[in-house]
Design a protein with these regions (language model features):
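Alpha/beta-hydrolase fold catalytic core
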Residues: 1-33, 52-56, 93-94, 129, ...
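Conserved HGGG/HGGXW glycine-rich cap/lid loop of the alpha/beta-hydrolase fold
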Residues: 20-70
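Conserved hydrolase catalytic core segment
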Residues: 94-137
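Helix-rich cap/lid subdomain of alpha/beta-hydrolase
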Residues: 132-196
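Conserved serine/cysteine hydrolase catalytic core
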Residues: 179, 189-250
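Catalytic active-site module of serine/aspartate enzymes centered on a nucleophile-bearing elbow/loop
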Residues: 254-291
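The conserved beta1-alpha1 loop
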Residues: 32-36, 101, 233
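Active-site loop/oxyanion-hole signature of alpha/beta-hydrolase fold enzymes
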Residues: 22, 46, 58-99, 277
Length: 291
């Protein structure tokens, strides 16, 4: 498909909050795409475009739909999982194919097991599954390895050129696909009061999400996952030192594990074509086996 494919930007009431999302029309089953901490659904755009019109694609935005302070423990991922289950229920979508990245992968897993999100298949890209002993620890923001950095994140640029120079200078963005980098510049930043640009997902909101990551242990849920699962791990991911995704795959009854060559933790941003092809193959196989 070409870049002419564009989603509708919609909002869904889930009872005590509203979640904005991108909706791509399609003729087939629903694919739910859930992003990583601090990012946004627009970064799925090349992948969503590749899935339509064979699939209907829904990509929600989880940043600030709930108020949470990082100093008070942040936003519990168990709460996010419940929100995702209600979001799908309110939209009337069930037995969905789900792809989550990082936070999105973990939240998706919790939503499936704890809140009954009906899924036909899960693709978990670099899920955040910390060592079990870290869950339940009450960390201060300055002691959390990710929240402490997020809350200090650079959050001001004079214009798009200034912002792009900054992004291109940072190791985090160095291997991103060019289209996705421009999508981040366009949708991941917004005008600030001083007429410059700032991050759409405020650093305090991002830090609150990171703080919430240690409040619920997802490991005991893995043996209860009932659908086929594919875990994708970046070959060069910096998560490898503390996240054992082979162990996670072994704990899930119908899971397989696959390495994405040349990718770091941000697999969808660095290898969108590989991810899109993998999703089409995995979801297509599930459809063929059920027909």
């Amino acid at each position: 498909m070409t870049s002419a494919v564009q989603p509708r930007v919609l909002r869904q009431d889930i009872g005590d909050a509203e979640i904005s999302y991108l909706s791509y029309d399609g003729d087939g089953p629903v694919v739910l795409l859930l992003h990583a901490t601090g990012f946004l659904p627009w970064l799925w755009h090349p992948i969503a475009r590749a899935l339509t019109p064979d699939y209907r694609v829904v990509a929600p935005y989880l940043c600030d739909h709930r108020q949470a302070e990082p100093e008070d423990g942040g936003l519990d991922w168990l709460t996010l999982a419940g929100d995702m289950a209600r979001f799908c229920d309110r939209l009337g979508i069930g037995n969905v194919f789900v792809t989550g990245h990082s936070m999105g992968a973990t939240v998706t897993t919790i939503a499936h097991v704890r809140f009954g999100l009906r899924t036909a298949g899960l693709v978990l890209i670099e899920p955040v599954l910390l060592p079990p002993e870290l869950y339940g620890i009450r960390l201060r923001v300055e002691d959390h390895p990710f929240a402490s950095r997020a809350i200090k994140r650079t959050n001001g640029w004079s214009d798009e050129e200034d912002a792009m120079r900054y992004l291109q200078s940072r190791e985090l963005f160095r291997n991103w696909d060019a289209e996705i980098l421009h999508l981040y510049l366009r949708h991941g930043m917004k005008p600030s009061q001083d007429r410059g640009l700032r991050l759409a997902c405020d650093p305090r909101s991002e830090a609150a999400l990171f703080m919430g990551s240690v409040r619920f242990d997802p490991w005991p849920l893995l043996p209860q996952v009932r659908c086929p699962v594919l875990i994708l791990e970046g070959e060069k991911s910096d998560q490898k030192s503390y996240v054992d995704l082979k162990k996670a795959a072994a704990a899930i009854p119908r899971a397989s594990h696959q390495i994405v060559a040349g990718a770091g933790h941000l697999v969808p941003m660095e290898k969108p074509r590989v991810v899109a092809e993998t999703l089409r193959e995995f979801f297509g196989a599930r459809l063929r086996s059920s027909s």
